[in-house]
């Protein structure tokens, strides 16, 4: 990277922290990377968060209230979209929602000030894609386990004229099959775009500061102020994207449970 230049996509580079390129199983590299590290940190934070709020105190503290509030939020989401049958999916959807939320938030921490460079795992499609495939696999498993081959009736909307079935069925099937792709892509694009924008603005700040007083006030100061606003927006996006992912998972589970 040239001096004074900022590479907007360098922050997404997967770097090996432990192991070598020769560490592989079945042709897949298993070296410990920065992505794996921050996913492990996210998982640890999630476990500590839940464990700390699991204490059933008569007068709940703030930690317990936070855990119960987040759990209640996800539970209401399931009830609203699936009904009473949605309660059994609470552990999975809660874990999914909290993991994405914490991963998004940890990637926004200003740890570079102390020499630590946070990594947003959800800015990689391999991560968001796996999360989406997990949800899709559960949807398929529930659908076929509960309805058998009748699950295919999901792709023929009620009241469809018989002559239209050969046309409607493949369209509905294709739209169903692309769900995991769109689910993972949405989260990946949202997180990557925000981080790239922040990096570009930081480049303007650095360049404007090095260019002179006039450029500093014309480019660096406005870019810095815009960065503050974008950071606040990114915090909002981090929560919204976790919510959208959980919401769509609930909607897809409802299709498997109730065939609509």
UniProtKB/Swiss-Prot annotation:
It is a multi-pass membrane protein. Its main location: membrane. It holds the Pfam family ATP-synt_A. CDD domains: ATP-synt_Fo_a_6. It is found in: Cell inner membrane. Keywords: ATP synthesis, Cell inner membrane, Cell membrane, CF(0), Hydrogen ion transport, Ion transport, Membrane, Transmembrane, Transmembrane helix, Transport. The chain crosses the membrane at residues 30-50, 96-116, 125-145, 151-171, 187-207, 213-233, 234-254. The keyword Transmembrane helix applies. One of its GO terms (cellular component) is plasma membrane. GO terms for molecular function: proton-transporting ATP synthase activity, rotational mechanism. Belongs to the ATPase A chain family. F-type ATPases have 2 components, CF(1) - the catalytic core - and CF(0) - the membrane proton channel. CF(1) has five subunits: alpha(3), beta(3), gamma(1), delta(1), epsilon(1). CF(0) has three main subunits: a(1), b(2) and c(9-12). The alpha and beta chains form an alternating ring which encloses part of the gamma chain. CF(1) is attached to CF(0) by a central stalk formed by the gamma and epsilon chains, while a peripheral stalk is formed by the delta and b chains. Key component of the proton channel; it plays a direct role in the translocation of protons across the membrane. This is ATP synthase subunit a. The gene is atpB.
């Amino acid at each position: 990277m040239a001096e004074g230049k900022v590479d907007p996509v360098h922050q997404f580079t997967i770097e090996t922290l432990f192991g070598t390129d020769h560490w592989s199983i079945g042709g897949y590299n298993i070296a410990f990377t920065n992505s794996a590290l921050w996913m492990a940190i996210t998982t640890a934070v999630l476990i500590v968060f839940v464990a700390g709020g699991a204490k059933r105190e008569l007068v709940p503290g703030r930690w317990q209230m936070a855990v119960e509030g987040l759990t209640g939020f996800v539970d209401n989401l399931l009830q609203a979209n699936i009904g009473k049958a949605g309660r059994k999916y609470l552990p999975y959807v809660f874990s999914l929602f909290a993991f994405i939320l914490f991963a998004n938030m940890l990637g926004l921490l200003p740890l570079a000030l102390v020499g630590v460079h946070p990594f947003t795992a959800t800015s990689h499609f391999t991560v968001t894609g796996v999360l989406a495939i997990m949800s899709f696999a559960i949807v398929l498993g529930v659908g076929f386990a509960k309805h058998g081959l009748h699950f295919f009736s999901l792709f023929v909307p009620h009241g469809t004229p018989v002559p239209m079935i050969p046309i409607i069925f493949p369209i509905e099937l294709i739209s169903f099959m692309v769900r995991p792709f769109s689910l993972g892509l949405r989260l990946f694009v949202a997180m990557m775009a925000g981080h790239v924008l922040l990096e570009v603005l930081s480049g303007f700040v650095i360049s404007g500061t090095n260019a002179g007083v006039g450029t500093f006030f014309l480019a660096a100061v406005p870019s810095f102020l815009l960065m503050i606003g974008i950071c606040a927006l990114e915090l909002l996006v981090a929560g919204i994207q976790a919510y959208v992912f959980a919401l769509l998972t609930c909607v897809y589970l409802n299709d498997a449970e109730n065939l609509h």
